[in-house]
């Protein structure tokens, strides 16, 4: 069977270059027919002459407590050494510990940063305190799920990876983070 796809309008591109991620390419190669038809992207542009104000591949959102901020910076340093552009923001930077503030911050990052996050890490257990927890949206009035934050365009599918390290204090943070650093 031969199938011909014709594009009309648009920019003759397969999506925006800034929304492509080297971390997703392996999955795309396995899941997309004719993956080789996609233009090859040189991801080195992300590492050249960019400051963190231009975005990051790995965004860490942390409560304002100093134990959490210190551990978030340790994780970011580890990821940066791995070649993953990482940035830490606190809940105060985001606009508060509310689903509205977090979702708006993440949506803005994805839609407007030169380098949109491919992954977001929420550091802290579910809760309302700005010093040691991060709130999660309640899906359909019964289920807390961070996946709602990852759905930027409203199609109920994630545009980025969301993860959470649950911890309530410095001791729990040390245990969790020591598992991968």
Give, region by region, the residue ranges found by the protein language model:
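Short beta->alpha junction loops
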Residues: 89-98
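Short helix-loop-beta junction
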Residues: 74-87
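Short, charged/polar "capping" segments at the starts of alpha-helices
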Residues: 66-71
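Short hydrophobic alpha-helical runs that function as membrane-insertion/retention elements
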Residues: 86-90, 119-121
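Structured catalytic cores of large enzymes
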Residues: 1-57, 62-65, 77-80, 98-181
């Amino acid at each position: 069977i031969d199938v011909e796809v014709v594009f009309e309008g648009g920019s003759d591109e397969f999506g925006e270059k800034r929304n492509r991620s080297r971390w997703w390419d392996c999955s795309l190669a396995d899941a997309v027919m004719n993956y080789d038809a996609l233009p090859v992207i040189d991801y080195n542009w992300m590492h050249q002459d960019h400051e963190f104000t231009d975005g990051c591949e790995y965004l860490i959102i942390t409560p304002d407590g100093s134990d959490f901020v210190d551990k978030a910076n340790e994780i970011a340093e580890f990821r940066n050494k791995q070649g993953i552009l990482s940035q830490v923001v606190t809940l105060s930077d985001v606009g508060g510990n509310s689903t509205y503030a977090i979702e708006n911050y993440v949506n803005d990052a994805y839609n407007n940063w030169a380098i949109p996050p491919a992954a977001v890490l929420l550091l802290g257990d579910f809760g309302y305190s700005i010093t040691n927890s991060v709130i999660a949206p309640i899906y359909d009035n019964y289920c807390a799920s961070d996946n709602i934050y990852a759905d930027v365009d409203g199609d109920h599918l994630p545009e980025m990876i969301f993860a959470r390290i649950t911890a309530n204090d410095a001791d729990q943070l040390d245990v969790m983070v020591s598992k991968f650093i």
